[in-house]
Structures are given as structure tokens and as C-alpha cells.
Amino acid sequence: MRTLFVGDLHLSTDRPDITQAFLRFLDTQLHDTDALYILGDLFEVWVGDDIAEPFAEQLAKAIYQASQKLPIFFIHGNRDFLISNAFAKRSGMTLLPEIYTVDLYGIPTVILHGDSLCTLDKPYQRFRKFRNLGWAKWLYAHLPKSKRLDIAVKLRSKSQSSNQQKSYSIMDVEPDAVLELLNATKTEQMIHGHTHRPAIHQLANGRRRIVVGDWYEQGSMLSVSQDKIELIELPFGK
């Protein structure tokens, strides 16, 4: 048996190939699997359940069907932090806090989306802190649909422009932040996404940091079993 992790799919109507690849993943890759964890940014953008497009409901039904075979867990990403517990429940997913610890075949493991670890990106961290304020979420949720969509488009455009000007190191996780979280959670292993830089990093004292891959050019999943850790590519169309 194994446990699977995916993240950073950025599903949208603009990329039906990714949507089809994910649906195929749900149909073909969940055999002999104890659980599936989705580590955020399942959607390219999510501005509220009331603006969910038909394809999102299609995905909700597919995920729900898969959840009848195994438990599926979801952690918010920076693109879909407004996904509600109601939508998660409708999809058969259990909504987890942004930092969560799990015993993974005897190894204490902390899992998260990963954006909170990019502490050198000061402007983004300030925005993230504001975004997570309860009153800010309430205010945004009560804006007209058209206004929320307009804000989402502008924020995405600003983010893409800003990222082009940021250095590689600023947009990656900060090693001190990784160590601090491992110590705070008393864990030996960390699994996250967000950076789109899949890798298995061996750290000091036998610790490990694993980054799941994105789904831009191909699918990607992390498979963890009792005796094997593997990042697996899933070519589109296969």
C-alpha cells in the first residue's frame, strides 16, 4: 500500500488537457492506495463557491466518486484559499489546516502547500498575512461576483509580472523556515508544493524535504510507501 500526494494542478477551463489528465489520474492511479492528499492550488483561481464554473462541479463529482474508495484530504493553496468546507464536503474531501502533521508509515511528517516557507518574498508574505485575516475574507466574500472576478484577474496578472522580476532564491523556500517548522512540529519529514520544483532533499540529521511537482507540462504525483519514496511523472495523453 502507498499514500499519494499531488498539488499545483491549477485546473481551469483554459487547460482542458490538465483537467482530463486529472480525471484519468483519479480513475487509474488510486489502486493499492491508503489515502490521497491534495496540497493546494487544485484550481488556477477560486473566488467563491457561487462562481464555480460547471467544470468545477464535474471535478467535484469525480473526486467524490474517488473518495468512496479511499480518504481524500485537501490543504488550501494560494490560488484556491477560498474553497469552502461545503465544497470540500460535496467533493468528498476532508479539509485540513494549512499545516498538518501525519504519521506516514512510522515517519512523523508535516505537510503544507508551501507558500508560507518562502519568507524572503516579503511583499507576498505581507499580502498572505492580510489575505488570511478573518475580516478580509468576510469582506471579499461579500463583494459582488463581478468585483471578485475583477480582483482575481488583477492579482493574478500582478503576481505573474512580479514573479518575472524576482530572483530564483526569493521565490524558493527559505531553509531556516523549513528547519523552524520541522522543529516546531517535531517531525522528521516535510512534504509541500507551491514552488513547482519537484525534488527529494536530504537534510541534516536524517531529515527529508519533498517537493511535489506541478501539472503544467505533465502530471506529477508523489508516492510514499513503507519502503519507497518516488516522484512519478504522468505524461498527458497516457
Curated annotation (Swiss-Prot):
CDD domains: MPP_YbbF-LpxH. It is a peripheral membrane protein. GO terms for biological process: lipid A biosynthetic process. It comes from the Bacteria. GO terms for molecular function: manganese ion binding; UDP-2,3-diacylglucosamine hydrolase activity. Substrate binds at N78, R79, D121, S159, N163, K166, H194. Its EC number is 3.6.1.54. Pathway: Glycolipid biosynthesis; lipid IV(A) biosynthesis; lipid IV(A) from (3R)-3-hydroxytetradecanoyl-[acyl-carrier-protein] and UDP-N-acetyl-alpha-D-glucosamine: step 4/6. Mn(2+) 2 binds at D41, N78, H113, H194. GO terms for cellular component: cytoplasm; extrinsic component of plasma membrane. InterPro entries: Calcineurin-like_PHP_ApaH, LpxH-like, Metallo-depent_PP-like, UDP-diacylglucosamine_Hdrlase. It is found in: Cell inner membrane. It catalyses: UDP-2-N,3-O-bis[(3R)-3-hydroxytetradecanoyl]-alpha-D-glucosamine + H2O = 2-N,3-O-bis[(3R)-3-hydroxytetradecanoyl]-alpha-D-glucosaminyl 1-phosphate + UMP + 2 H(+). Its cofactor is Mn(2+). Mn(2+) 1 binds at D8, H10, D41, H196. Keywords: Cell inner membrane, Cell membrane, Hydrolase, Lipid A biosynthesis, Lipid biosynthesis, Lipid metabolism, Manganese, Membrane, Metal-binding. Binds 2 Mn(2+) ions per subunit in a binuclear metal center. Hydrolyzes the pyrophosphate bond of UDP-2,3-diacylglucosamine to yield 2,3-diacylglucosamine 1-phosphate (lipid X) and UMP by catalyzing the attack of water at the alpha-P atom. Involved in the biosynthesis of lipid A, a phosphorylated glycolipid that anchors the lipopolysaccharide to the outer membrane of the cell. Belongs to the LpxH family. This is UDP-2,3-diacylglucosamine hydrolase.
